[in-house]
C-alpha cells in the first residue's frame, strides 16, 4: 500500500515541480472555494470525530484541537487564499555570479520533492500542509491521528477533487487513513520516495520519528514557553500579555506554560494577576515564595513538581516561579525550556538585549505574547510546523522552509583547467 502511495507521490511531485505559479494558485483557489462550498459536509464529518472523542473520554484541550466550526473553517480557507497571495519561492535566484573560469553560476530554489507529515488531533493541519506543499511544488503524504479520521477523510476528498478540477494529479495530496500504527513505521522507512518527515504533535510522536525514521525529520512543536516579568515592566500591560499568552487558546504549542516573576515585585504583581484572571479558570502550580503569595491571593494553586516544570500543559494550568533576577530567569529557561518561544516583559533596553542574546529559542519576544509564533502571524501563510531544531529550518515553517536549492551552472562549452 505505502510503496504504491510513495511512487504515486513521487510521480506527482515531478509534475508539480514544473508548474507555473499561476497554475499552482489556480488549484489553491479551487481548494479554498470547495472548503466553503462543502462546509456542511465537512462539519458533519467533524461532528462524528467530536462525538467519538467525548465517548472515549478525551480531554477538553484535545477536543478543542479536534473541533472545526464554521468560523475555523472560514479561517482555514482564508489561510489558503493568503498562501496564494504569497510570493512563490520556487525558481527564485538566491545568489550567484560569474566565476574566473567564465562559468555563470546561480543558486536556485527548488521543491524538496515528497513530504511526509504525521500529526495528531488537528484537522486544520491537513489543509495547512497541503496548501503549503502545493504552492512549493511538493507532493505530500499525510497521516493524521485516529481521532480525526472522519474529518481528514472528507478534507482529503475535497482537496483531491479540487486538484482534478485544476487538471493536476490527485495523488499530489494523499492520506493514510488506516489507523494501524504499523503504517506509521512503514512511512518512516519510505526513504526511496519521501524526502522529509514533519511530525506535528507531542514529544512522544517526535521521539518516535527521531528514533525510527530513515528520512530526515524536522523536530519541534513541543512548547514549554516562558514569560519573564522583570521588575521594570509595566505591570498593568504585562497582565494583559500574560492573559493573552495563557488563555487565548491554551491547547496550542505557543501558549505560556511557565510564568517567571522577579522577586522584588512578586508580592505586588501576583495578586493583581490572580484578580485579573479570576474568571478564566486558571489553575496555578507553584512552590515556596510563589506558592505562599498565590495562596494568600486566593488563587486555585497547588505545589508544582519538577516534572510539571517540563510539561507542555495544553490547558489552563500555569506554572509560576519567582526568580531573583534576569540571570536566574535565563538559567531557568535554559534548564526547562524547549527552544520554542520565550518572552521578557521589561522597560530596560539593556536587559531586553541581554535576554535576546542569551536565550536560545526559535522565537524570542520583548514585551509581546508568545502566541505570535505562528506562520500566519509571521506573514508566512499557514505553517507546516514550528521547528525547534537548528538545521534546515527554525521557528514557523512557511514556504521557503519547504524548498531546497540546486546549483545551476552555465558555460560556453567550458572545461576545468
From Swiss-Prot:
It is an enzyme of class 1 (oxidoreductase). GO terms for biological process: L-proline biosynthetic process. GO terms for cellular component: cytoplasm. Pathway: Amino-acid biosynthesis; L-proline biosynthesis; L-glutamate 5-semialdehyde from L-glutamate: step 2/2. Coiled coil: none annotated. Transmembrane segments: none annotated. It is found in: Cytoplasm. It holds the Pfam family Aldedh. PROSITE patterns: PROA. Its EC number is 1.2.1.41. Keywords: Amino-acid biosynthesis, Cytoplasm, NADP, Oxidoreductase, Proline biosynthesis. InterPro entries: Ald_DH/histidinol_DH, Ald_DH_C, Ald_DH_N, Aldehyde_DH_dom, G-glutamylP_reductase_CS, Glu-5-SA_DH, GPR_dom. It catalyses: L-glutamate 5-semialdehyde + phosphate + NADP(+) = L-glutamyl 5-phosphate + NADPH + H(+). The keyword Cytoplasm applies. One of its GO terms (molecular function) is glutamate-5-semialdehyde dehydrogenase activity. CDD domains: ALDH_F18-19_ProA-GPR (cd07079). Belongs to the gamma-glutamyl phosphate reductase family. Catalyzes the NADPH-dependent reduction of L-glutamate 5-phosphate into L-glutamate 5-semialdehyde and phosphate. The product spontaneously undergoes cyclization to form 1-pyrroline-5-carboxylate. PANTHER family: DELTA-1-PYRROLINE-5-CARBOXYLATE SYNTHASE (PTHR11063:SF8), GLUTAMATE SEMIALDEHYDE DEHYDROGENASE (PTHR11063). This is Gamma-glutamyl phosphate reductase. The gene is proA.
